[in-house]
């Protein structure tokens, strides 16, 4: 009987890592991952991903797709191009990427995505989109080394890269 509180505490501690991190809301002033002025303006509709660093040479970048078809790529480290690069594609690109993000449920606060064990030093994919109020953004972190996130992370990143046609900008030159 005396062990019941201890067992309950242990069960809670093991359950915490298994639950997914909930999406956060960031106001416009905090809407840039790199600091400074965000690449989006209040009222704009966008979806975006950002690849984070890892123990190796994972590309570090941000990739935004806007409702009007604008694409903005920011290469930071281990990318084919560094700095800010822009291109214009059709609005269909935004629609397809928005659909992919919504279907992944990465930004759904009610989603029950189970996160299993995680490998060390794997990159984190940040998934973002404008919030309904138009003045802030929704953001979620997906660790590519965690069970439950690995496939979703890989699929979302591939979808963004394929639809925005930025492979040459992303792949480092040899």
What are these regions (language model features)?
Residues 1-7:
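Bacterial N-terminal signal peptides that target proteins for export
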Residues 7-15:
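Bacterial N-terminal signal peptides
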Residues 19-55, 93, 104-174:
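Short, well-ordered, aromatic-rich surface patches in folded extracellular/luminal domains
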Residues 55-57, 81:
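Short, cysteine-centered beta-strand-loop-beta hairpins and adjacent loop/turn segments enriched
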Residues 59, 63-76, 121-123:
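A short, structured beta-strand/loop element
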Residues 61, 83-87, 134-139:
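Short beta-strand segments
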Residues 73-109:
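A short-motif feature that recognizes glycine-rich, charge-decorated loops
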